[in-house]
Regions:
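Conserved acetyl-CoA-binding loop-helix of GNAT-fold acetyltransferases
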Residues: 105, 111-128, 147-151
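Acetyl-CoA-dependent GNAT
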Residues: 49-107, 180-182
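Glycine-rich phosphate/pyrophosphate-binding loop shared by adenosine-nucleotide-utilizing enzymes
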Residues: 17-19, 79-85, 172
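C-terminal "cap" of GNAT-fold acetyltransferases
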Residues: 162-189
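A short beta-loop-alpha structural element at the N-terminal edge
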Residues: 19-32, 180
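Conserved catalytic-core motifs of GNAT/GCN5-like acyltransferases
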Residues: 137-138, 150-172
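Conserved beta-strand-loop-alpha-helix junction that forms the acyl-donor binding cleft
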Residues: 110, 136-146
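Helix-loop element at the rim of GNAT/NAT acetyltransferase active sites that forms part
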Residues: 29, 34-48
Length: 189
């Protein structure tokens, strides 16, 4: 079992900056709002929710439930600010053994490995939480992201044509990627 309050992991990015991973808590409200408010619209158009909606972000902080959604933050230790957010959304009922991974990295910290490191940590956390599968829905045009997931054991299981629609009405194909967390023979019910 993970101690959600005490959990900390320290990593070094490709540029040498030190970053701490920890879970979202009620003290992170303003920083989380800032992370998304500062992001250009272009960076947010492929997210499933309107993260510019302050009420939505407030609801995440007000209703933290680590058994439902595991929100992992990346904190830049130099500036003490949130630079990335990764969430592990747990399935319910017949899908309770499946977690969906979503990752957002602020533009200044992209291509430095923070997203990949957070993905690796999501895999480790899924193992500790007893999940059997991880899934991700990735925009097909985002080749680097698809490659990063593939490198970490995810397989493309389906391409869903025109599955994602942006606010402006433009549709995009989604690649559904899955990764087993435990081998089938290790799984217990």
């Amino acid at each position: 079992m993970i101690n959600y309050v005490a959990y900390r992991k320290f990593v070094t990015l490709q540029n040498g900056k030190r970053v701490m991973f920890r879970f979202l808590n009620d003290q992170d409200r303003e920083e989380l709002i800032r992370l998304f408010q500062d992001a250009p619209e272009e960076d947010l158009r492929f997210l499933k929710q309107n993260v510019k909606d302050i009420k939505l972000v407030n609801s995440w902080v007000d209703n933290i439930n680590y058994q439902r959604v595991l929100p992992l933050l990346a904190i830049n230790l130099e500036a003490n600010n949130i630079i990335a957010d990764a969430t592990l959304h747990r399935g319910k009922h017949a899908a309770k053994h499946i977690g969906e991974v979503r990752i957002f990295v602020s533009r200044p910290f992209r291509n430095l490995g923070v997203g990949s490191l957070m993905l690796e940590e999501m895999i480790n956390l899924a193992k500790k939480e007893g999940l059997h599968w991880l899934k991700a829905e990735i925009i097909a045009d985002h080749k680097k992201v698809v490659k990063a997931f593939r490198t970490r054991g995810f397989e493309a299981r389906a391409t869903l044509e025109d599955y994602f629609i942006r606010k402006d009405g433009v549709t995009h194909d989604i690649i559904l990627m899955l990764r087993p967390v435990v081998k089938r023979e290790e799984a217990e019910f």
